[in-house]
Amino acid sequence: AYPHWWYGDTGKVKPFGQKDNGGDLVETAFIMQALLSVHQYYIDGSPAEQALAARIDKLWREVDWNFYRQNGQNVLYWHWSPEYGWEMNFPVHGYNECLIMYILAAASPTHGVPAAVYHEGWAQNGAIVDPHKVENIELHLRYQGTEAGPLFWAQYSFLGLDPIGLKDEYCANYFDEMRNLTLVNRAYCVRNPKHYKGFGPDCWGLTASYSVNGYAAHAPNERDDQGVISPTAALSSIVYTPEQSLQVMRHLYEMGDKVFGPYGFYDAFSETDNWYPQRYLAIDQGPIAVMLENYRSGLLWKLFMSHPDVQKGLKELGFSTVSKLSLIHIS
């Protein structure tokens, strides 16, 4: 698996934390989701494009998902280090941003995991199902450590994975669930219980981003709300809440160069603290472009869902979909 960070000029690992200096299976899943989409885009292209697709296929086949079961357990672990081994000790349970990791682990043609790893590890034998209301909006999944997580939980797994009509035994419709998670985030910001300046229907969206106090995972609860709006939160939600997200986009654009620069909207800001850092974070910028295109044409969803290994993995885990966008019907 790939590390969370590495130096582009040397290929050496840049530690994400003291003991997080090795493989990161979640970040590996995110890049593989992207690469499999690129593979499908180029697979029938020119000789050079087909050669690139072949290189991607080699990278895909080399990821050892099964190793991250830590001696054959029916759960996937987030980290492994050549120096510290399994000391990070982070078994991944749902729901959070990591759904795609379990799907790709089942989809791997070379180092795949059995369906029991998903059902016992991610879904914890059904404990992931937890019907509850937040901001008077219905949610049906258990969110790790909170009643409703930050918005990247509704986005990262679904940059390529098409949520429309996607279901399994734990969730009747992933699109509806993620839309409701987004609406919870918006409703919390509109209610604005901590009375931050600027929050409202035109300015909402809590997710992981820079903040006044460093990088933080902002979420719709008073503990995790620091008054920081991250444009990626609402903009990358455009597939779920097009009207509400466009309302935020127009408002942010009208705010001018305090929040908008040469590469689009800056990562985060706080009107309460008069904090406008004017800096970018790639993992926040990227989903904006991807989700805008998925909203416009469904392109990335179509590409990813068309990969035969992805279809195999979804089927093995018991997923079905009737999405008209992806044109792939799995039952």
Feature roles, as predicted:
Residues 1-327:
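Ser/Thr/Asn(+Pro)-rich, low-complexity disordered segments
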